[in-house]
């Protein structure tokens, strides 16, 4: 689980936009960039080279994702 305070502070390094946390996959999602940044051992890996590209069929913002807006 990622601390809510950390989620409030972090932004996408590519776009500067907000991130959502996918608890099932342990990833920080940037819908604007279409990327998912991994969270390993509770540490967000905020490197574009480490991010996975989102697939079109993946959940959109607000569906089963925790974001800094959901407080």
From Swiss-Prot:
Coiled-coil positions: none
Identification of the protein by name: UPF0434 protein APH_0052
Feature: compositional bias, Basic and acidic residues: 52-63
Signal peptide interval: none
Organism: Anaplasma phagocytophilum (strain HZ)
Pfam family, one: Trm112p
Source species, domain of life: Bacteria
Residue ranges of the region described as Disordered: 52-71
Protein family per UniProt: Belongs to the UPF0434 family.
GO cellular component, one term: cytosol
SUPFAM superfamilies: Trm112p-like
Disulphide-bonded residues: none
